[in-house]
Amino acid sequence: MSTTMETTKISQQDDLWKNMELGQISDEEVRRLMKIGIEKRIKWGTKPTQQEQLAQLLDFNKSLRGMKMATEIDTLENHKIYETPESFNQIIGGKESAGLFTDETTTTMEEANTKMMDLYCERAGLKDGHTILDLGCGAGLLVLHLAKKYKKSKITGITNTSSHKEYILKQCKNLNLSNVEIILADVTKVDIESTFDRVFVIGLIEHMKNFELFLRKISKWMKDDGLLLLEHLCHKSFSDHWEPLSEDDWYAKNFFPSGTLVIPSATCLLYFQEDVTVIDHWILSGNNFARSNEVILKRIDGKIEEVKDIFMSFYGIGREEAVKLINWWRLLCITANELFKYNNGEEWLISQLLFKKKLMTCI
């Protein structure tokens, strides 16, 4: 392709994204374009033989081991998906990860989130009195759930977002919870002397690069008999740095800085057991994440004027920028919905792994 044609194509895609941000492209057209992108990504990642598929996974894992723990923390420190207003968190349900939609009777984010968090507790074998660490705790939905459910436990959450810390501590005060500590820190740099009975890492490893270094760091915070429950989004077969595959790959290009998001394969983390050992592994349908985003989209649309005012006040932006930010969130929900419901939720999935600490043995 000539340089002129490439420049024209880039310009067309930039115009497309600008029109999407302004809400000038219909949801139906966005979904159609997303499906085209999904099929291109599947074609790119799916190899003709199982041996080639395995080789792709092993090469990907090898490349991760040569990287630093994470590349995006500074880039995304004030990213709009993390630094969000308290009132907006309440509108969307307070959690960016998937809820558990076990059947058609589950319709609200609150119910789905509670079901998923109860599943975490069950699979981690939580008991009242356990010390618990929630890495990348976000707006604190899991922290608060655990603090209310396990009154004798001490729950520590780590977030790199000051507004989230303030919100969680405010909720603890309102709920009269005294068993919560929130640490404001970059998880890749923070040093904690304490060790914990249970560690939760929900929707965080997708923002890491060197999984070996990350899991080694976590293992140092686990008691000898401690357990780690880790959840991540995944593809059934291939791992992906989520970089644009071409100039028209608008959805991979515009939501996160290029290459800062990792979507591992369903089996990727099984190859990183230097410091922790997998003792159980579950795969949940991608429909859970698809429906979560569908519900969030409806909640945003149902209070769109309120959301606009919230964004203008919190970020100190004008009406046009607030509209763009609302459309950014809407587009994120639409694309995630299409991605995770593809192939009836059996293409992109949710992986949950339970690890124990690997203890040093003397010979």
From Swiss-Prot:
Entry keyword S-adenosyl-L-methionine: yes
Coiled-coil residues: none
Tissue expression remark: Expressed in roots and stems. Detected in leaves and flower buds.
Enzyme class, one word? Answer: transferase
Catalytic temperature dependence: Optimum temperature is 30 degrees Celsius.
Q: What is its EC number?
A: 2.1.1.337
Q: Which SUPFAM superfamilies match?
A: S-adenosyl-L-methionine-dependent methyltransferases
- Reaction equation(s) it catalyzes: (S)-reticuline + S-adenosyl-L-methionine = (S)-tembetarine + S-adenosyl-L-homocysteine + H(+); (R)-reticuline + S-adenosyl-L-methionine = (R)-tembetarine + S-adenosyl-L-homocysteine + H(+); (S)-corytuberine + S-adenosyl-L-methionine = magnoflorine + S-adenosyl-L-homocysteine; (S)-tetrahydropapaverine + S-adenosyl-L-methionine = (S)-N-methyltetrahydropapaverine + S-adenosyl-L-homocysteine + H(+)
The source's superkingdom equals Eukaryota
Question: What Pfam families does the annotation carry?
Answer: CMAS
Report the GO molecular function annotations.
S-adenosyl-L-methionine:(S)-corytuberine-N-methyltransferase activity
Q: Which UniProt keywords apply?
A: Methyltransferase, S-adenosyl-L-methionine, Transferase
Residues reported to bind S-adenosyl-L-methionine: 96-97, 132-140, 159-164
Report whether Calcium shows up as a keyword of the record.
no
Q: Which CDD domains match?
A: AdoMet_MTases
- Entry's Gene Ontology BP terms: methylation
What is the pH dependence?
A: Optimum pH is 8.5 with (R)-reticuline as substrate. Optimum pH is 7.0-9.0 with (S)-reticuline as substrate.
Role noted for this protein: N-methyltransferase accepting primarily 1-benzylisoquinoline and aporphine substrates possessing a tertiary amine. The preferred substrates are (R)- and (S)-reticuline and (S)-corytuberine, but can also use (R,S)-tetrahydropapaverine, papaverine, (+)-bulbocapnine, (+)-glaucine, (+)-isocorydine, (+)-isothebaine, boldine, noscapine, narcotine hemiacetal and hydrastine as substrates. Involved in the biosynthesis of magnoflorine.
Record family assignment? Belongs to the CFA/CMAS family.
PANTHER family attached to this UniProt entry = PTHR43832, S-ADENOSYL-L-METHIONINE-DEPENDENT METHYLTRANSFERASES SUPERFAMILY PROTEIN
Q: What is this protein called?
A: Reticuline N-methyltransferase
- Gene symbol of the encoding locus: RNMT
